[in-house]
A protein has these predicted regions:
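S-adenosylmethionine
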Residues: 1-254
Length: 254
């Protein structure tokens, strides 16, 4: 993998602390961490039919991402994909995955929603939602009885379809998927949401380890275009935030 020189020069200027630069370069030769997020509602249903979550957890050697949580609250786990593959298990094709018992998600992506402090009654918006991992995390924290709702938006039509499929597979009924521009939503939902997530589309530098296409597509111009688009999205998001609400901005790169 040949990383763009402009990108490396920029990162070298940022990473000035001792050892940071070498650690950063070394990270490109490491395997990316993989994770799954367990659907506790589906697990509880399966346990009534004889399924044992504890046995499954031990068989797959699942380790919690957030170790400070109590065992009964743990949903996010690291998974050793290569080890499972050697045992004949493909986490993307396993029946438990098809049945919605878990969702495959990068561990770093799991850290965003807990920062939002979602309450059961919140009106939530995930403005750039596909493929849906963070939307599903939010939906898991809302209560239909207390009026909690989630609007999951994805502007790209094909990605919106994937988002809908994932929500259906995981069995969540307290979210609605829409396919709109942020500006259009802002016209229809002024000062409406108490929690908004903008997981903004970015220049894809976090995908360099996984995708040669991401490396080929990168350029300083792409970074500038992404930054401009993110500003436009954030402006629309702010118009939809009710007084006293919270807006969470996250992105893997700029």
């Amino acid at each position: 993998m040949e990383i763009p020189k402009e990108f490396l020069d920029r990162m070298r200027a940022i990473l000035q602390e001792e050892g940071e630069w070498q650690s950063f370069l070394h990270s490109f030769s490491e395997m990316a961490k993989r994770g799954i997020r367990v659907n506790r509602k589906k697990v509880e249903e399966a346990e009534k039919e004889g399924f044992s979550f504890r046995e499954w957890k031990e068989k797959w050697h699942l380790e919690p991402v957030f170790s400070e949580e109590r065992e009964e609250e743990q949903r996010e786990f690291y998974v050793e994909e290569e080890e499972l593959r050697e045992s004949g298990i493909s986490i993307g094709k396993d029946p438990y995955h098809e049945g919605g018992l878990y969702y495959i998600q990068d561990p770093s992506a799991m850290a965003v929603v807990p920062r939002m402090e979602i309450r059961p009654f919140d009106r939530c918006l995930d403005l750039c939602a596909s493929p849906g991992g963070k939307s599903l995390q939010i939906a898991d924290l809302l209560s239909e009885e207390e009026g909690g709702i989630l609007l999951s938006n994805e502007y790209v039509g094909e990605r919106a379809r994937i988002l809908s499929q994932n929500a259906e597979r995981m069995g969540y009924c307290n979210l609605a998927v829409v396919n709109e521009t942020p500006a259009s939503l802002a016209e229809n939902f002024p000062s409406y949401f108490s929690r908004i997530l903008v997981d903004a589309p970015c220049s894809g530098e976090g995908m360099f380890r996984k995708s040669e296409e991401a490396v080929k597509d990168w350029s300083p111009l792409l970074v500038e275009k992404c930054a401009e688009r993110q500003r436009d999205i954030l402006e629309s998001a702010f118009r939809m935030l009710r007084e006293g609400g919270e807006l969470c901005y996250s992105t893997c790169t700029f």
